[in-house]
Regions:
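Bacterial N-terminal signal peptides that target proteins for export
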Residues: 1-6
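Bacterial N-terminal signal peptides
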Residues: 7-15
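Acidic, histidine-bearing metal-coordination/catalytic regions of metal-dependent phosphoesterases
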Residues: 20-143, 148, 169, 389, ...
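Acidic/histidine-rich helix-loop elements
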Residues: 59-95, 141-161, 227, 231, ...
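Extended active-site neighborhood of metal-dependent phosphoesterases/phosphodiesterases
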Residues: 91-94, 98, 112-130, 189-287, ...
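Conserved, compact domain cores that house catalytic/ligand-binding motifs in diverse enzymes
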Residues: 138-217
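Active-site neighborhood of phospho(di)ester-bond hydrolases with catalytic His/Asp-centered motifs
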Residues: 143-145, 175-181, 185, 206-212, ...
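Active-site-proximal segments of metal-dependent phosphoesterases and phosphodiesterases across multiple
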Residues: 151, 263-269, 287-328
Length: 430
């Protein structure tokens, strides 16, 4: 009898040990140079996970490279956060999270790779993920924002992911650039968890900026950059207090400067961000491989989409003029707004100046209407919205001659286009 009892106990223990680990929130982010590196972010419920990667199309996984995460830490940022579940019921979320991050380096430019999240025995815990490294002279990306993924209203996420597919059907792209507010409450771990289950996160590299919704929790006063830091793995090359939320990366000929609107709300922090940007752009232009284009991204809008009033345009335009920024992208206002190239407050022929553009919302729920343009009539060339139920996104095509941005509606119809000309850099920054 004792032998039988011992056998049952050992069998139960063996069964418990055999239970697979759980992982979630897998996403591919760029390394500082996306032609040779990528950064993988994921979460696990226990230690011991890793990554296996290989060239896309290579047979089997037996020769794949296995790597352990360079960071795997217990995350408490989401503990006891007040939220709602998918049924709309009030809950306090208490997830068990080991936040993992890994940088893949020495990759081949312009090459597609595949990877799996695996356990310590190299058994798969995830579906197959893929990404394309930079390196092609011509490439495309999809630009989207403000879909406020909210599990009690799943149609928001469905609308945005369908819009991404619509952009892909119009012009096949290599990766996705988002301009913030991808979740309704950044403090709700379950919202991120549900969003990252979508197919589009398995198929592309994603780069983005933090929005105010990504920063905040359901309750007033709950907000931190750690919500973004623990759901992504962006390069740690921002200024010290803001690393992995403010950051920069190269994709082909473009230097992307990614700003944190939630930090840049005081004169002191804006001064820090501008000094950091001057250093990044100056070093890049002085390097042996200077960027052809500089693109700045943030969440908060340059102009009020309803009235045309200057918002962050007045805070940043002189710096953009000074640094020769080619394109400034933003979201937040839920209304599409764009200028032609602007330099020192005047529209130019495109040989100098910055094109300012802000994206519409894409969730079919939180769009806004426009009113008569009251300010900046000479600068703002196009506005667009479908009202409350707005869905839109952009195709961005880059080659050595120009960046072509095309706004599409939910039906894949072209609403607006603007071209950003490549400019000759006549002088280098000191």
């Amino acid at each position: 009898m004792r032998i039988r009892f011992l056998f049952i106990v050992l069998s139960l223990a063996s069964s418990l040990l055999a239970v697979a680990q759980s992982i979630c929130n897998v996403v591919t982010n760029p390394a500082a140079d996306a032609s040779t590196g990528m950064r993988i972010s994921w979460a696990a419920d226990s230690a011991g996970t890793g990554v296996m990667y290989k060239l896309a199309g290579a047979r089997g996984w037996d020769r794949a490279v296995y790597l352990q995460p360079e960071t795997a830490t217990r995350c408490t940022a989401f503990d006891s956060i007040f939220s709602r579940n998918a049924r709309g019921e009030d809950v306090y979320e208490i997830p068990t999270i080991i936040k993992c991050g890994l940088t893949l380096s020495h990759l081949r430019p312009n090459t597609r790779y595949e990877y799996l999240i695996v356990d310590s025995h190299r058994r798969p815990l995830s579906q197959t993920y893929s990404f394309l490294t930079a390196g092609a002279s011509e490439w495309n990306c999809c630009i989207i924002s403000d879909f406020h993924s909210y599990t009690p209203t799943p149609k928001r996420l469905t609308s945005a992911m369908t819009m991404i597919d619509t952009v892909q059907a119009y012009c096949p792209f290599d990766w996705v650039l988002h301009l913030g507010d991808v979740v309704a409450w950044g403090g709700s771990w379950s919202f991120w968890q549900r969003m990252y289950q979508e197919r589009q996160f398995r198929e592309y590299m994603w780069a983005g900026v933090q929005g105010n919704h990504d920063y905040m929790g359901r309750e007033k006063g709950v907000g931190t950059n750690d919500f973004t830091r623990n759901t992504t793995y962006y390069p740690a090359n921002g200024f010290p207090e803001d690393e992995r939320v403010t950051y920069h990366f190269r994709y082909g000929d473009v230097l992307f400067i990614m700003l944190n609107s939630m930090t840049n709300r005081t004169a002191e922090n804006i001064t820090k961000a501008k000094a950091w940007m001057r250093q990044v752009v100056g070093e890049a232009r002085a390097s042996q491989n200077p960027p052809r284009y500089v693109v700045v991204c943030q969440h908060f809008e340059w102009f009020n989409g309803r009235t045309g009033q200057s918002n962050d345009y007045k805070r940043w335009s002189k710096t953009f003029d000074e640094l020769g920024v080619d394109l400034a992208l933003a979201g937040n206002n839920h209304i599409y707004v764009r200028t032609d190239a602007v330099y020192q407050g005047v529209t130019t022929n495109g040989s100098t100046g910055t094109v300012y553009l802000q994206t519409p919302s894409s969730d079919n729920a939180r769009g806004r209407t426009i009113s008569t343009l009251q300010s900046n009539q000479k600068l703002i060339k196009r506005r667009w919205t479908e009202g409350k139920n707005t869905i839109g996104a952009l195709s961005m095509k880059v080659n050595p001659q120009r960046i072509l941005l095309t706004l599409l509606n939910r039906y894949g119809e072209v609403v607006d286009t603007v071209s950003v000309k490549a400019k000759e850099q006549t002088k280098r920054l000191e």
